[in-house]
């Protein structure tokens, strides 16, 4: 699954795969040695000295984590081109219903399989590389008083997830602080004036965030469409939403990849409860 996504990303990028300097692979679907990063390097025929980073068991916030790491690598290694791949196969979480763990049914109802890939770099080559979004600022934080809100354990039975019912409340309670930290330096306080890419942990989370911030329903349109079409694909979701947004923006003749707007936010929520924040700037279409 990850290979298919990577092949598509490299083709659209338009550069030879020999130009890839770093690989970040993220999955919550299993643990192997050598890891999925090694397997993908072999499957794609990448150079053996590509610098690899393997992220296991991070959960749903990791779509933001991989972007943050890729940004740091690209900015601190001149000429770096980072292949980012998130691949999730949620069959490892599937099991029969249990009276003692009804919360795991919520996850099984929401989860889906998916893989997404992109290339991250700085100083794009004119006429060859066509950026889609620019990452301006990133942050990671642990929400206060949230320990145990989302957790997972890899055991003989597979991957078990446990979700507290107040997860949507914890996310909505902490999102305002994250937004102020991200957008105050840009003098942005109207969150309807930016585009939104939020990890769709479930409809209840999106509903509470909309209500808390007074967001217009169309702000979460791309997010809800991905959740409806594919389910919660853990780390891959926010990358699917990025793709959905830039394609719809082009189809509708809007002026930027971010629904015609300049600034936007990408949020990842997951075990901890951990929140990843990425401030994005769109690119003219």
Swiss-Prot record:
Gene Ontology BP annotations: flavonoid biosynthetic process; polyketide biosynthetic process
Keyword Acyltransferase: yes
Biological pathway: Secondary metabolite biosynthesis; flavonoid biosynthesis
Residues of the active site: 60
MF GO annotations: naringenin-chalcone synthase activity
Keyword Acyltransferase: yes
InterPro entries referenced in this protein's UniProt entry, alphabetically: Chalcone/stilbene_synt_C (IPR012328), Chalcone/stilbene_synt_N (IPR001099), Chalcone/stilbene_synthase_AS (IPR018088), Polyketide_synthase_type-III (IPR011141), Thiolase-like (IPR016039)
CDD domains xrefs: CHS_like
Domain of life of the organism encoding this protein: Eukaryota
Keywords associated with the record: Acyltransferase, Flavonoid biosynthesis, Transferase
Catalyzed chemical reaction(s): (E)-4-coumaroyl-CoA + 3 malonyl-CoA + 3 H(+) = 2',4,4',6'-tetrahydroxychalcone + 3 CO2 + 4 CoA
Enzyme Commission number(s) of this protein: 2.3.1.74
Primary role: The primary product of this enzyme is 4,2',4',6'-tetrahydroxychalcone (also termed naringenin-chalcone or chalcone) which can under specific conditions spontaneously isomerize into naringenin.
Family (UniProt): Belongs to the thiolase-like superfamily. Chalcone/stilbene synthases family.
Protein name: Chalcone synthase 6-4
Organism: Medicago sativa
The gene coding this protein: CHS6-4
């Amino acid at each position: 699954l990850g290979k298919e996504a990577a092949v598509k990303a490299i083709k659209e990028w338009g550069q030879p795969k020999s130009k890839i300097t770093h690989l970040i692979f993220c999955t919550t679907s299993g643990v192997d040695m050598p890891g999925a990063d090694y397997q993908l390097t072999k499957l794609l025929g990448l150079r053996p000295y590509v610098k690899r980073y393997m992220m296991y068991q991070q959960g749903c916030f990791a779509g933001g984590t991989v972007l943050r790491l890729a940004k740091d690598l690209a900015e601190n290694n001149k000429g770096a081109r980072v292949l980012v791949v998130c691949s999730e196969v949620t069959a490892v979480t599937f099991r029969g219903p249990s009276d003692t763990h009804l919360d795991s049914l919520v996850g099984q109802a929401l989860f889906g399989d998916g893989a997404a890939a992109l290339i991250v770099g700085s100083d794009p080559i004119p006429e060859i590389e066509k950026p889609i979004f620019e990452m301006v600022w990133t942050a990671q934080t642990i929400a206060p008083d949230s320990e145990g809100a989302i957790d997972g354990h890899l055991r003989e039975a597979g991957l078990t997830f446990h979700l507290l019912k107040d997860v949507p409340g914890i996310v909505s309670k902490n999102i305002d602080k994250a937004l102020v930290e991200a957008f105050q330096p840009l003098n942005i306080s109207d969150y309807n004036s930016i585009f939104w890419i939020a990890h769709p942990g479930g409809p209840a989370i999106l509903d509470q965030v909309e209500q808390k911030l007074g967001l217009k329903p169309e702000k979460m349109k791309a997010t809800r469409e991905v959740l409806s079409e594919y389910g919660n694909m853990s780390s891959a979701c926010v990358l699917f939403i990025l793709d959905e947004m830039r394609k719809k923006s082009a189809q509708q003749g809007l002026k930027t990849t971010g629904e015609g707007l300049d600034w936007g936010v990408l949020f990842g929520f997951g075990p901890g409860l951990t929140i990843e924040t990425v401030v994005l700037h769109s690119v003219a279409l």
